[in-house]
């Protein structure tokens, strides 16, 4: 009995111990339960996310693959079988991309072929001489030859070219006919304004160059001074810009974006070119600005930004470089570039400037480049052609070529204006100023007292001295040279043009390109440094088809130029004084920086003397 109680008591104690143990186990720290709950939540979230991703993938596949059977199979496929489907989709995307690329390439090829066919047909039409589409490098506008011009017989065209002494060298063989009168110009908004009402017919350089420049071609124009070269490039410049929409720029942008740039070697020539060009531009709503050294930069900047930017800039190289370097001007939108007096622009003093300016423009394939000049040395030709694409070369006057390859590819020899009567007087250096005074009094006698006379000196100090000497003699005289401020130079030039002052003393700064009307006489007090400058000096008279006269006072100090001067006189069929021949006819042509080369002017008709030995 007692053992039974003892056994039951031990069982009860074990039961209590188990219950206590269970309670103790259930009462474990709460942290463990929290961790379990967190793990459980994370697992549930992960499962939900995976289900959501699978669902989105399934919907995407349903959209990409239309057959319903494939969609059903995809749902039932396990994860291991989903990989081939993804690969299949990737391959399909690659295939679609490849097909699109092939279509794009075929389309581009087709457009290239059509462009080639159009250009071929255009060239054929040009050759036939019926209609003349543009052979434009930039394709901005076209030139259609007038029906009346196309209808003219070829013999009449040849007679015109011969009479006007026009020689055209065209690498493209486009057979463009010269525009012989203004009615043959293609109709446009500008031409409808009748801008040439004051003129009778185009000058030879305008007549021959316009068909090429209006076609968008690059052009080299070589003609004597006073032949109308300024209008030869002004008309195609304005027509080119007027046919294109003007790009819009941010009004807050303090950088001018011109579409055309004309570069001139001197301030005076730049101002003169701007005056002619702006007259045409204003007729079709284009703006033009002239920038040059010696004037206030801020005023010129304000002109550049006025009216939402400028369309055409006429500039001297120095001031244009300044504005480019400071960011006031960007040439990135230039489609029309002109180098006026190109031989001087590309000569040693300006060649680096021109390279800098043209490098700021679009490539030569994307712009039209024109160069006009009175002289065109061979080395400058090669340099200039690197800026142009197949330029058409128009030469006015019977200019022979020295050297070359026998096909007219040598250097174009310099020639003076044949309408200018040239006279050379060999004088004592100490008596030049008194002889100048005598010539002026003789030239301004009677009814000729108001004739305008241009007097050239070599140095600035000499110009000041001559001006003071003539002023003391009672002659109304003004001067223009590098030591004067720009406003003083402009005032002197305007006084001479208006006739207030009848005598203008100038250095060579005024020799290049200035169009001063009604200059009756040019007097060279001192011979210039080069024969080219001599031709430009005397070219200030006899302009626009009129007659002129030039007198040169030659001294023993100038004898190095006697040979070149004799050749110029003979080519123009002018008398050569015996006193000048005494200085010799040797012509120095620079071939080496240190030594040079000397060539003697030999009469080809003179027979050699046979030498016999006993």
Swiss-Prot record:
A motif (Q motif) lies at residues 180-207. Residues 210-394 form the Helicase ATP-binding domain. InterPro entries: DEAD/DEAH_box_helicase_dom, Helicase_ATP-bd, Helicase_C-like, P-loop_NTPase, RNA-helicase_DEAD-box_CS. The Q motif is unique to and characteristic of the DEAD box family of RNA helicases and controls ATP binding and hydrolysis. Coiled coil: none annotated. The lineage of its organism: Eukaryota, Fungi, Dikarya, Ascomycota, Pezizomycotina. It is found in: Nucleus, Nucleolus. Residues 37-58, 91-109 have a biased composition (Basic residues). It is an enzyme of class 3 (hydrolase). SUPFAM superfamilies: P-loop containing nucleoside triphosphate hydrolases (SSF52540). This is ATP-dependent RNA helicase dbp-3. Pfam families: DEAD, Helicase_C. GO terms for molecular function: ATP binding; ATP hydrolysis activity; mRNA binding; RNA helicase activity. Residues 435-584 form the Helicase C-terminal domain. A motif (DEAD box) lies at residues 340-343. Transmembrane segments: none annotated. It comes from Neurospora crassa (strain ATCC 24698 / 74-OR23-1A / CBS 708.71 / DSM 1257 / FGSC 987).
């Amino acid at each position: 009995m007692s053992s039974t109680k003892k056994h039951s008591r031990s069982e009860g104690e074990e039961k209590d111990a188990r219950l206590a143990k269970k309670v103790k186990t259930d009462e474990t720290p709460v942290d463990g339960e929290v961790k379990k709950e967190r793990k459980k939540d994370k697992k549930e979230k992960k499962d939900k996310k995976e289900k959501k991703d699978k669902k989105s993938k399934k919907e995407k596949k349903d959209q990409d693959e239309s057959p319903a059977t494939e969609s059903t199979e995809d749902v039932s496929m396990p994860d291991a079988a989903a990989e081939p489907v993804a690969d299949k989709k990737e391959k399909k995307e690659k295939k679609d991309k490849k097909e699109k690329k092939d279509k794009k390439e075929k389309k581009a090829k087709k457009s290239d072929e059509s462009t080639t066919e159009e250009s071929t047909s255009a060239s054929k039409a040009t050759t036939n001489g019926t209609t003349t589409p543009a052979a434009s490098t930039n394709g901005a506008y076209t030139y259609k030859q007038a029906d009346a011009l196309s209808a003219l017989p070829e013999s009449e065209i040849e007679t015109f070219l011969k009479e006007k002494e026009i020689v055209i060298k065209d690498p493209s063989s486009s057979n463009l006919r010269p525009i012989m009168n203004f009615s043959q110009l293609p109709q446009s908004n500008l031409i409808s304004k009748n801008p040439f009402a004051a003129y009778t017919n185009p000058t030879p350089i305008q007549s021959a160059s316009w068909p090429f420049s209006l076609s968008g071609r690059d052009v080299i124009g070589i003609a004597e001074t006073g032949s109308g070269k300024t209008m030869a490039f002004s008309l195609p410049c304005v027509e080119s810009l007027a046919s294109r929409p003007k790009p819009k720029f941010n009004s807050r942008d303090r950088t001018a974006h011109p579409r055309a740039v004309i570069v001139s070697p001197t301030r005076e020539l730049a101002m003169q070119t701007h005056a002619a060009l702006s007259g045409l531009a204003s007729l079709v709503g284009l703006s033009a600005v002239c920038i040059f050294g010696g004037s206030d930069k801020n005023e010129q900047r304000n002109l550049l930004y006025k009216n939402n930017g400028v369309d055409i800039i006429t500039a001297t190289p120095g001031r244009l470089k300044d504005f480019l370097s400071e960011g006031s001007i960007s040439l990135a939108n230039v489609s029309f570039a002109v180098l006026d007096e190109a031989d001087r622009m590309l000569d040693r003093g300006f060649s680096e400037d021109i390279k800098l300016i043209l490098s700021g423009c679009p490539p030569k394939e994307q712009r039209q480049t024109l160069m006009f000049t009175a002289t065109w040395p061979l080395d400058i030709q090669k340099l200039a052609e690197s800026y142009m694409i197949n330029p058409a070369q128009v030469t006015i006057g019977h200019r022979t070529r020295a050297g070359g390859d026998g096909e007219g590819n040598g250097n174009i020899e310099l020639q003076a204006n044949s309408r200018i009567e040239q006279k050379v007087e060999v004088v004592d250096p100490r008596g030049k100023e008194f002889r100048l005074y005598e010539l002026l009094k003789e030239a301004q006698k009677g009814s000729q007292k108001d004739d305008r006379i241009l007097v050239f000196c070599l140095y600035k100090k000499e110009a000041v001295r001559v001006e003071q000497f003539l002023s003391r003699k009672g002659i109304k005289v003004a001067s223009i040279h590098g030591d004067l401020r720009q406003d003083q130079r402009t005032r002197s030039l305007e006084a001479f043009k208006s006739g207030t002052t009848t005598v203008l003393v100038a250095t060579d700064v005024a020799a290049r390109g200035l169009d001063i009307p009604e200059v009756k006489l040019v007097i060279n007090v001192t011979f210039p440094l080069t024969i080219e400058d001599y031709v430009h000096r005397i070219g200030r008279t006899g302009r626009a088809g009129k007659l002129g006269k030039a007198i040169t006072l030659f001294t023993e100090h100038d004898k190095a130029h006697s040979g070149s001067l004799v050749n110029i006189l003979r080519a123009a069929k002018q008398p050569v004084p015996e006193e000048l021949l005494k200085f010799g006819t040797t012509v120095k042509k620079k071939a080496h920086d240190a030594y040079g080369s000397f060539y003697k002017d030999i009469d080809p008709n003179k027979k050699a003397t046979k030498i016999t030995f006993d």
